């Protein structure tokens, strides 16, 4: 079974290199979510869906943070070869999430060079975060038909509550 990795916001497909290097017994692919032509969550979702819909072998979708939210959302699409999900640090509902709004405000206030030092694009991060302000995957999580492994570190305070809620909905 193939493993398909989706990275988080501010990261790249290269972020999964060490994990993929360890899992050499499994065919795998890390999808680059953003490019100069694909710079919004909606465009990413459509492009990744088109890619996954053409996948000819069974696969597990593995996502971190934004990639986990995307994986969960895509689980509600018609993907005949999708078999399971692995979600790490998945935001369930950003709509009304005070910490998320504070993060977005900080993104807007930070100078561009701070993002560039991290290899990130400020305009992209602010734009995608603005788009995600209304994200609410509660309904999708409640009907997710796939076996799902949820992963969240005990010190990941911003995501721990969300992952606990997700666990209740998926179980």
Cite the ranges covered by each PLM segment.
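Conserved HGGG/HGGXW glycine-rich cap/lid loop of the alpha/beta-hydrolase fold
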Residues: 1-37
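Gly/Ala-rich beta-loop-alpha elbow adjacent to hydrolase catalytic centers
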Residues: 63-71
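Active-site nucleophile elbow and catalytic-triad environment of alpha/beta-hydrolase enzymes
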Residues: 124-140
